[in-house]
Amino acid sequence: MQEKDDTRPLLVVPYMWIGDFVRGHTVVRVLKQRWPNRPIDMLATSLCAPLVDYMHGVRSGIVWDLPRSRLAVVRQWELAAQLRARNYGTAIVLPRTWKSAIAPALAGIPERVGFVGEARFGLINLWRWGEKALPRFIDKNAALALPEGTPVPPEWPVPQLNVPTGEAERWRQANGLGTGAAVALAPGSVGASKRWTYYPEAARLLAEYGLDVWVIGGPGEKALAAEIIAAGGPRVRDLTGTDLRNGILAMAAAEVAISNDSGLMHIAAALGTPTMGIFGPTSPYHWAPLNGLAATVQTKTTVPCQPCHRPVCTMNDHRCMRDIPASDVVAIAGRVLTEAGAPVAH
């Protein structure tokens, strides 16, 4: 049987951090190029599951809420029973962990592709080697979708999130957000070192330009949203919450998004919303969205320890983020808005 004629269902086991889950759509697109007739499902946490609804080429998401710190063997057996009933021919296991490979193995999926990782002999039966030779995270992931031995291409298909026409507008109306030009701010991130702290001042300046400002994030950003609203005034709205679909639709409806290096940055870019990514301790080469950014914002000063990729600044000055003034970010946002054709009052 030729690869193009294969119709067996295929399972992708992605990383479950939001940004990495979005990158997983590149893997789906590569698989669809290789096997256009194979249905593709993705495992997803409850948090990430809404993303699947906007990923072309994904048949369905299978919710998989396993605790991060335990193997949860009983839950693995329950998941394996679900997978077995779907008759998958292949599982592409992106994470390197034991835990990510257990259920596909218990389900008896014939082809289980992945890097050896945590010595997963037996759990993974189509091993791949050379992971350390691949420079970027996306190269390591998407290479698993290619036939073994295929050279890694210089460019990959970019992730795409497609919100149906009218859905974002209906969401905007339902939330009473009006029709004015809006900037979405995503001030959160995993790791304090990646958080730019001048969002309140940026919100104030954006509001003075006559722009609506939406604060997007999870429940952990509620206090920060209140601080941003206090600085920015009535044009600023708190849209943080527990439902990621809310964040997806907000990013789809906004004229521009300003984000730290976080999952919401990847969502905005994959939606096609002009996105500004603020980078301090992390490298845009390794972690910026494949889709490209309308602006990559970094400090203009030389910071010898940058990038450190540490979750907390060990120098205790956080200069890589502190030396990016709000006025610079807002000026860049004004240019991005103008290029996008959005009206900006000065």
Protein language model features and the residues they cover:
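Catalytic machinery of carbohydrate-active enzymes
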Residues: 1-346
